[in-house]
């Protein structure tokens, strides 16, 4: 039913398969959930960006026309926009496996704009529960002033529309992504 555009697993990039151990250590430390001191934040952000760039490069190397790209997890929130810069016509989905914070919490992050713009590079963003999707919409409309919410299920930013979906059934629900892509054809 989905033709040749059916999602496929084409690559798995991991931070452990590259030679930049210093970046890996900084990235792992930043993602470990430990609290960061203010003087460490710039260093951790640079490692985060670098790791997202490496994932993007891996996708670019294996991408073939018609592939769907599905990115998973908060540790790769910049990847959709990075991929979009190289592959403007690619179909990109992103799945957020953790709660998305409220705008009151999110607005204190120094790189809040970059994170939101990174996510909005996706065609679809999946959340676990409706409240997390609402938090994302509120963050976008408050932080990215040019953003508009099209109902509760879509965000428009800089001429692109990103669809939001809620899939409570499981963490890796490829069926939800397939359905979203299929419905977008009509």
Placement of each model-derived feature along the sequence:
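Catalytic cores of carbohydrate-active enzymes across secretory and cytosolic contexts
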Residues: 1-12, 17, 23-176, 183-186
